[in-house]
């Protein structure tokens, strides 16, 4: 990854914006800062105002691990597209995913609720996925051991994957964020995309991005990330949006 805010990065951003791209963003850790309690997450006012202005110039998408219903009220603006549950929940898709294969895991969670609570593991059921949060656990080793035990012998129809202090579980055949962004590019009638994300599930976009896309990771802490560029931290997201506005107003 290379820093976005240098000469090469700014040149790449200018080129892709002049190609009239889809602008796609993750939510937690990207548009909204990471917080201890997931329910407290909101897009800062300065960021939401910039996004609202961008949405009048280009199609904007939010592609998040949260459910569509959950994230919609946290944005402060109306994007053209919202895709939730790591790509599995797309209201614009003609056929919705059958997530009934999660029911067995739901029953397993209910049976072990006391053990999970004692270990500091919070379970979030988002319909198309389950998320096991362990950010607030006092003993991280104990929390992770509890999660591993819960998922031992997991139904092969399910797929677990990690994130920042979370383990997510979706249907094995569920679309991921890479599938979602590729679909949105086509539906928006765009030839290119800008995608900004910060977590493990955003790598699905970074890995499969076409050469003319611009991919940006928030944070440079993962040397193996396949993003093309990086921002130092969440505080630089607002600056990026302002640069985008400046360029798009001249196109």
Where are these regions (language model features)?
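Substrate-recognition/cap helix-loop segment adjacent to the acidic, metal-dependent catalytic center
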Residues: 67-83, 138, 142-159
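Non-catalytic pre-domain segments flanking phosphatase-related domains
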Residues: 1-27, 32-38, 46, 53, ...
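Charged, glycine-interspersed solvent-exposed loop segments at helix/strand-loop junctions
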Residues: 120-138, 158-171
């Amino acid at each position: 990854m290379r820093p976005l805010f240098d000469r090469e990065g700014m040149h790449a951003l200018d080129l892709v914006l002049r190609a009239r791209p889809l602008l796609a963003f993750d939510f937690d850790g990207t548009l909204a800062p990471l917080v201890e309690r997931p329910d407290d997450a909101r897009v800062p006012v300065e960021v939401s105002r910039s996004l609202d202005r961008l949405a009048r110039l280009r199609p904007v998408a939010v592609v998040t691990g949260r459910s569509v219903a959950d994230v919609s009220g946290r944005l402060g603006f109306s994007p053209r597209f919202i895709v939730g549950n790591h790509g599995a929940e797309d209201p614009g898709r003609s056929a919705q995913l059958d997530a009934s294969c999660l029911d067995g895991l739901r029953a397993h969670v209910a049976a072990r609720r006391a053990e999970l609570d004692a270990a500091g593991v919070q379970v979030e059921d988002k319909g198309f996925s389950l998320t096991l949060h362990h950010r607030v656990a006092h003993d991280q080793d104990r929390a992770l051991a509890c999660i591993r035990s819960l998922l031992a012998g997991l139904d092969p129809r399910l797929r677990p994957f990690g994130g920042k202090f979370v383990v997510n579980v979706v249907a094995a055949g569920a679309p991921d964020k890479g599938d979602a962004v590729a679909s949105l590019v086509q539906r928006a009638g765009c030839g290119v995309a800008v995608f900004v994300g910060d977590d493990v599930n955003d790598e699905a976009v970074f890995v499969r991005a076409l050469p003319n896309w611009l991919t940006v990771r928030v944070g440079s802490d993962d040397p193996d990330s396949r993003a093309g560029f990086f921002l130092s931290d969440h505080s630089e997201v607002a600056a990026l949006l302002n640069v985008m506005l400046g360029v798009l107003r001249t196109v």
